[in-house]
Amino acid sequence: MAIINNHSSINLDAGFQGDHSELLQFFFNQGLNIEITDDVSSLKTFLESLSDEEYPYNFDAAFNESFIDKEGFVLYLKNSDTIVSTYAAKGLDKGIFKEGMKEIYEGNYEVVDIGIDPACYSSCQWVAKSHRGKKFGMCLDHLKKNIIFDKTRFGINYAIHKESFKDYHINGLHYSNSEKFATIPNGDVGGAGEKIDKVYNIAWISKDEWLIKRNEVKSLYTS
């Protein structure tokens, strides 16, 4: 099993692989390869090709543009050539993100202080139904955080999620915080919720907080 480096500027090199050997070995032991790329258009094409049963969300509009000057990346877990899980992240200051979300989704927005920019927004997490319940989503999220904090300049990672996923983001994905961010009467926030989901939280973690947590979570990859 292998790391497939298809990104123009981020390389998951031997040093990175050594620092995160337990996490990477978790995937390799399941017969999965890990690909990193900056081709976000292929991610959109792939997610939009899935059935509503597999991926019941609209594509996140924050990832409609290329990653030029955004320091973004896409992660794929692959069983041979078959994609079984995805994730994406990009540099996006929280204020710009909020204003962009307001333009698309009418609603009531809260004032939440998540820390000092530069910040990295992540979304487009998906695991194939055939591979759910095996910790792949959690572990790919942890890999994403390691890449953000080891390989980019960002000091904050944040994400949007429906309110009912707060426990999962705190105790599963190991974000440090999750607070109410917006009430969207029509729901259906791309990458985060369906039409029935009206209340959304913002989850976040700083680099310093993650450096402490990631030693604590290593046991999750071997248990």
Question: Could you tell me what each predicted segment is?
Answer:
Residues 49-83, 88:
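Active-site rim helix/loop that mediates acceptor-substrate recognition in acyltransferases
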Residues 34, 75-77, 83, 136, ...:
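Hydrophobic beta-strand residues in large extracellular and virion-surface proteins
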Residues 83-124:
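Conserved acyl-donor/pantetheine-binding loop and adjacent beta-alpha core of acyl/acetyltransferases
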Residues 34-42, 79-80, 113, 119, ...:
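Exposed regions on extracellular, virion, or secretory-pathway luminal proteins
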Residues 71-75, 118, 195-201:
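Short beta-strand micro-motifs in enzyme catalytic cores
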Residues 63, 106-112, 143-145:
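Short secondary-structure capping micro-motifs at structural edges
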Residues 1-40, 45-57, 65-67, 125, ...:
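Terminal substrate-recognition subdomain of acyl/acetyltransferases
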Residues 127, 132-147:
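Conserved acetyl-CoA-binding loop-helix of GNAT-fold acetyltransferases
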